[in-house]
Amino acid sequence: MYVTHLSLRDFRNYERLDLNLEPGVTLLYGPNAAGKTTVLEAIYFLATTRSPRAGADRELVRFEAQGDLGVPPFARLVCDVVRADGYVRLEVVVQRRAEEESAIGATPTIKTVRIDRKAVRALDLVGNLRVVLFTPADIALVTGAPAERRRYLDVTLSQIDGRYVRTLAHYQKVVQQRNSLLRAWREGRRPLRYADDELAFWDRELAMAGAYLLRERLHAVVDLNALAGPLYCRMSGGDTPLTLAYQSSVAGIDSVTDSRAIEQAFLAHLTRLRDDEIGRGQTLIGPHRDDLLIAVGGVPIGAYGSRGQQRSATLSLKLGEAKLMRIRTGDAPVLLLDDLLSELDAERRSHVQDILERPDQQTIVTATGTDDFDLKFLTRARRWRVESGHLYPA
């Protein structure tokens, strides 16, 4: 799949942008804060309804944007996508609420999502455009907290499988409700004698949803091992592959892929932890507490790898994610690579540029200049110079 046209209005530093895109490699280059990363952010937002860098959606609306006829300012993003199964238009509008509405506790923004001009839920948008985003901050996937690695798996699987994204949303709500009950018992706001009866329903909901998420994550990790490992070898020029191991908080299911068996193990573990969970006021096991162990030659790369190894590992995982999407869906995702070559030595830069040589894969790369790219890459890339929220053919 590929994006043929991107239209932005009052998004970040873009007052207006209409950009035609093609399959293959596109290079956006220019000084920092010119708007290169914003183009990638916009495409990612249209694919997932989430920004990879904004703390709140209201930050996406251009600061100087003015409302019309009493309508508060808004950002509008539209893209046209060609997929293996046809054409689709995606649109997201983020509108600031009027000050008086925000003052009474309403959310600061209203988000409207449309597919082919028909209003839909945000969840329904996910998967219509599949993207893989790599940014310098993504090194946290290797070096950061477990939440970073869980998010990596969730974003990948949510774009592949509509059931996964819906189950994940349901699971998160169940965890919130269950934690609310556990805190109430811990604080003495509910009688403990009813705890088992009240938790029975939520335990079943948690185990059913959690079992599906766990099964799909375990399958994905097996596939990613086979895909990302060789990519790391090619990128690093060595023969020691990257390896992944899923670490579940539910004892004994790290390699079990039968949903019913996972569900039963989940329920049994919840029963054993009942007193501990009430004492701490939170759900102690489940997909929201799991981790993904990343190693090279059996050594955890987050703790002991060099910066170059960590960055190569992160990029290998992202490119492995793209391959997994292609295999599972029959359609290649759009690759969004921000500041791709920074912190890589000359050898790794060369390997990365060779790996990206796929004319049927839309790849959009950003950089501050062109000096780090080889002539072969620059010759086949469509180049745009970005300055102060404007794009110029180069």
Curated annotation (Swiss-Prot):
Pfam families to which the protein is assigned, alphabetical: SMC_N
Key words, A-Z: ATP-binding, Cytoplasm, DNA damage, DNA repair, DNA replication, DNA-binding, Nucleotide-binding, SOS response
InterPro entries in the record: DNA-binding_RecF (IPR001238), DNA-binding_RecF_CS (IPR018078), P-loop_NTPase (IPR027417), RecF/RecN/SMC_N (IPR003395), RecF_2 (IPR042174)
Compartment(s) of residence: Cytoplasm
GO BP annotations listed: DNA replication; DNA synthesis involved in DNA repair; double-strand break repair; SOS response
The keyword rRNA-binding belongs to this UniProt entry's keyword annotation: no
GO molecular function: ATP binding; single-stranded DNA binding
Gene Ontology CC annotations of this record: cytoplasm
Binding site for ATP: 30-37
Domain of life: Bacteria
Keyword DNA damage: yes
PANTHER family (alphabetical): DNA REPLICATION AND REPAIR PROTEIN RECF
Family statement drawn from the similarity comment of this UniProt entry: Belongs to the RecF family.
Function noted in UniProt: The RecF protein is involved in DNA metabolism; it is required for DNA replication and normal SOS inducibility. RecF binds preferentially to single-stranded, linear DNA. It also seems to bind ATP.
Protein's name according to its UniProt entry: DNA replication and repair protein RecF
